[in-house]
Amino acid sequence: LIRRPFFSWLAPSRIFDQIFGEHLPESELLPVSPSFSPFLMRSPILRMPSWL
């Protein structure tokens, strides 16, 4: 049984060890590299509507 996937460098390792229903703080969900943040932190609330 493989515990960690090959792309574990993209996300914190605790996500893969998470027990269903356990709360993860936002600090553990944020990417380590700032180059990923524009892609992962796109919130529909913060984006401009397409009709503007």
Curated annotation (Swiss-Prot):
Keyword ATP-binding: no
GO molecular-function terms, A-Z: protein homodimerization activity; structural constituent of eye lens
Highest taxon of source: Eukaryota
Keywords, sorted A to Z: Eye lens protein
Family statement: Belongs to the small heat shock protein (HSP20) family.
Subunit organization: Homodimer. Aggregates with homologous proteins, including alpha-A-crystallin and the small heat shock protein HSPB1, to form large heteromeric complexes.
Job of this protein: May contribute to the transparency and refractive index of the lens.
Name of protein: Alpha-crystallin B chain
Organism listed in the record: Turdus merula (Common blackbird)
Gene giving rise to this polypeptide: CRYAB
